[in-house]
Amino acid sequence: MSRSEILFANAQKHIPGGVNSPVRAFRSVGGTPLFFKHAEGAYVVDEDDKRYVDYVGSWGPMILGHSHPDVLDSVRRQLQHGLSYGAPTALETEMAELVCSLVPSMEMVRMVSSGTEATMSAIRLARGYTGRDSIIKFEGCYHGHSDSLLVKAGSGALTQGVPNSAGVPAAFAKHTLTLPFNDIDAVAECLAQVGKEVACIIVEPVAGNMNCVPPAPGFLEGLREQCDKHGVVLIFDEVMTGFRVALGGAQAHYGVTPDLTTFGKIIGGGMPVGCFGGKRAIMECIAPLGPVYQAGTLSGNPLAMAAGLTTLKLISRPGFHTELSDYTTRMLDGLQQRADAAGIPFVTTQAGAMFGLYFSGADDIVTFADVMASDSARFNRFFHLMLEGGVYLAPSAFEAGFTSIAHGDKELEITFAAAERAFAELKKA
């Protein structure tokens, strides 16, 4: 038995399913999940000492690559002063100032401890600000595991084939209206009927939890227009896209300004953290200034702030995001060429340093239906073949992939060699 098999068997004795987040269990792709013990640069190393080119990047935040020395040094320096105080620090103010300077739509920001907490708090804030109860989300978009958002969610929920979670009261779900992603006509029709009841629209500007589906031309602009028309708060969930699609996030890349924005662990260099922020008039509704309560003992914890400040400063250098995007384009072009040569129906999508891989004969992937029509069984086989070739992809056909600035020509060679073998094997099947 491999070390991962032994560790997984032991983990299942005391951890439900042997994992602390469902997608890690490999239920979608089959087999035993890998247990990792080390990561550096573009690579992760499992408990059997096998190295893999990593296209998961801890689900997005490792934009500098793993174990960047400057980030580690910043954490070591902070460690000498303590782990957490449960009190204000200069670091969190510096982080808030930096985030607001990089993302102009964010006039004020509140730190939290996860992306789920950020989206949950942003929705509560939108409800408190508007005095309305209903929210609109989109099919296949995942915004964390808070009760009101586990309705036709993407990510692990798609992987398991369960659109809703047990334990979510019907009274919660009835306030969540779910519409087709990239369908602005459906949004306009819905708001024409119930706009006075809707507090907010929350959207991933690039849907990163049904793999990677960029917005259709005019979709985000249409959301902004409809929200303005009906007095609805527009929330961009940029937990995945923030500081990755562009320095100012997807909102900068696509030129559409939301009212509120949520970010995740990238602002902590991969440590547990998140934040939400936006217009001052809305943010001043949060306690202690306003009636909307939100709190957290570890919010703005100094280790995450130290790591995040270093990360954001490093990715702010001119040309950083162009390099990231160029690598991603080269990688996807190479995969497409090899799939075409093998006669395998295959489509890729890209938004900056995010990407999607679909075994599909469609010309493009635009809707939730397009995603669900792709061949997930073939992806599962591809995943394991790539793993054998030393390439670690997300263990689900419905999760986006991520590149880092540490990926380069050597990693392309490994990726392309593994892909050639994988597509050849798929052709035989």
From Swiss-Prot:
GO terms for cellular component: cytoplasm. It catalyses: (S)-4-amino-5-oxopentanoate = 5-aminolevulinate. Pathway: Porphyrin-containing compound metabolism; protoporphyrin-IX biosynthesis; 5-aminolevulinate from L-glutamyl-tRNA(Glu): step 2/2. Its main location: cytoplasm. InterPro entries: 4pyrrol_synth_GluAld_NH2Trfase, Aminotrans_3, Aminotrans_3_PPA_site, PyrdxlP-dep_Trfase, PyrdxlP-dep_Trfase_major, PyrdxlP-dep_Trfase_small. GO terms for molecular function: glutamate-1-semialdehyde 2,1-aminomutase activity; pyridoxal phosphate binding; transaminase activity. Keywords: Cytoplasm, Isomerase, Porphyrin biosynthesis, Pyridoxal phosphate. It is found in: Cytoplasm. The keyword Heme does not apply. The modification N6-(pyridoxal phosphate)lysine is found at residue 265. It is an enzyme of class 5 (isomerase). Pfam families: Aminotran_3 (PF00202). Its EC number is 5.4.3.8. Its cofactor is pyridoxal 5'-phosphate. GO terms for biological process: protoporphyrinogen IX biosynthetic process. HAMAP family: HemL_aminotrans_3 (MF_00375). Belongs to the class-III pyridoxal-phosphate-dependent aminotransferase family. HemL subfamily. Homodimer. This is Glutamate-1-semialdehyde 2,1-aminomutase. The lineage of its organism: Bacteria, Pseudomonadati, Pseudomonadota, Gammaproteobacteria, Pseudomonadales.
